[in-house]
Amino acid sequence: LSLMDHGGIYRTLLSVHMKRPWEDVVAFAKAAPRRIIPTVRIKGRGYHRGPRNKYFDRLEGQLGSDPFGAMAEVHVWHDSDGGKYHEIRIDFDDELFLAAFDAAKGKDWPLIVHMEFAALSFIGKRDYMDKLETFLRSNQDHPVVMIHMAQLEEPDVRRLLAAHYNLHFMTSHASPFYQSGGKPFINMINDGKFKPQWKKLILEYPDRFVFALDNVFSKFWMPDLYLDKMKMWWNVASDLPNDVAQAFAHGNAERLWKLTAKPDGVMKAPHEAMKALGPVTGYSANAAHR
């Protein structure tokens, strides 16, 4: 919470990773119910490795816990990046995907879909794009959010937004911070602002973009990196008209996930918060965890 305060973040949709039990995120949310939204974990044992019943058991257990208010990303295509990660390649009619989608529909939660289009061949991209659009047309009454901008550049995103009014995009990993790794994430930002084509598109579709970070690994929660990202994103958002910036930063997420609106004036920009609050406190501030 101290890290969020310093970064100007009022609320976080939080899930668990690796061997951490999902009950932990429920406990975090109970301790700070206005700030932490516990988010159902999809990936993990049974989804991309091991017996499938492990996934179904985990999903059922989480869905039976009242505090959950969102569902984390559902992987359809996840590249291994040369063997560094588990590759996931399933279709929209796979029982794993459909179980998550049915659960999201039952809870009236947006479905976050993980697709890495830039890591596919030309034919692979074409085939998965056809499958995605078929799914979107078949479920026009349910909001779908593509995490990491689906690794798509502006022309593809523009076409998809025009064709599918239930489609939204999350800006996680779509920044200069992710251009030196092995995965081909797009970069929406140049010189501390949205690139012109992206700013134009956001202004045309102000209700379809959701600010997000995807803090998968512990290093992403370390104060220096986290706050550098948040300083950048606050500056980027400040180049938008205020109503569009507010929608991008939190309003669209509040609408899609049916969250209470962020109270006015409760958060400061990172450069102001860091002066007012002093050092970050809590677990992530301990250098031993870096």
Task: Identify the residue ranges that each predicted region occupies.
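Mid-domain alpha/beta scaffold segments of enzyme catalytic cores
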Residues: 1-99, 103
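Catalytic pocket-lining loop regions of alpha/beta-barrel enzymes
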Residues: 30, 34, 46, 87-211
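Mid-to-C-terminal alpha-helical segments outside catalytic/metal-binding sites
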Residues: 1-16, 203-208, 216-290
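Active-site gating loops and adjacent loop-to-helix segments of metal-dependent hydrolytic enzymes
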Residues: 72, 78, 166-178, 225-233, ...
